[in-house]
């Protein structure tokens, strides 16, 4: 089983079926491997494939030219999500925080458009904003490379920004009923993958009512104004890549499949 069910977060009862039915779980997270091992499943930690794929394809200067980056401005990445309901709920908050930042620092903002979100939809929310905002297409890791800081919705994006060593604040909101049910069913301390990996908050999290423009500004502004504070966070998120292993996840999975299949075949022959 590769990319296994998240028994570490919820529905741990599923582990019994997995233990019964699978020959091997190829785990992408250390804490996931621990959860499956405790459940009695045969498990091997192989690492996350993103550890291999998250890297820029351009030099810094090439990326600056490609995205029309302004060297005289702080470049801030806004990542409101890949679903319309996420973008509708989070982008206005991010834009309000961006307005706050722009009043204190000379900033350039970038929104990488997810393939599921039409550009017209983003522009309808941005409206007639006076902010310097670029909506970008593709080369997301090159864009991360040139940015000073980021505000992102929860999900894989925060793992990607951590692997790119980009200081990020995670924001997310659910409908009140959904949030109530999530608190009943989900049993993890953090929402962000970097924090789950490290067992501590290296990527600040703002959830539900705390996900507001004032709080986002309070976290981002020190990173933008004080390079030493930004570097301190970078040193923390550098540990995320170390926690994910040395890369080569896909090759390890392939080797594991061959070895496991060989072992099973050998037992059958006996």
List where the protein language model places each region.
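Nucleotide-activated sugar donor-binding and catalytic core shared by glycosyltransferases
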Residues: 1-270
